């Protein structure tokens, strides 16, 4: 759990910096995390801990690189229409006997918009943070969750 969700981000950031970003003194590092890194969720403690760790890494590294033109941010999607969400819905159905509609309703209940996040909404947030107009945004954990957080 920690290797996939925390160590991999650390190593990726480390490699990006070593591959020339640090020498150039400019660039964008963006981690895709989860709202679990902002608030946590029951029954996924290790996952939430790893995601909290990525946000801590993001904030600390942003401070270390603040005097360069390298920004470090995290995007924290809520429940997003992906295969991972499909597995979560199936898991709820299997463990609780709820219908698909009930399982989906349970997951969207925390989203004030009452829906799942679309993958392209997450991608657009990442693209903005990688773009030329985001130079003063660093050390942030941007929630893309329909107002959940």
PLM features per residue range, with description:
Residues 1-11, 30, 54:
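Catalytic Tyr-X3-Lys loop
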Residues 13, 50, 58:
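Active-site helix of classical SDR
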Residues 18-19, 63-64, 135:
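Alpha-helical segment proximal to the catalytic Tyr-Lys
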Residues 34:
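Residue(s) in the substrate-gating loop at a strand-loop-helix junction
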Residues 39-45, 67-68, 114, 132:
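Active-site loop immediately N-terminal to the catalytic Tyr-X3-Lys motif
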Residues 40-48, 60, 88:
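Active-site loop-to-helix junction immediately N-terminal to the catalytic Tyr of the SDR YXXXK motif
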Residues 66, 71, 137-139:
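Short, small/polar-rich loop/turn modules that mediate ligand/substrate recognition or access, typified
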Residues 113-144:
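C-terminal substrate-recognition "lid" of short-chain dehydrogenase/reductases
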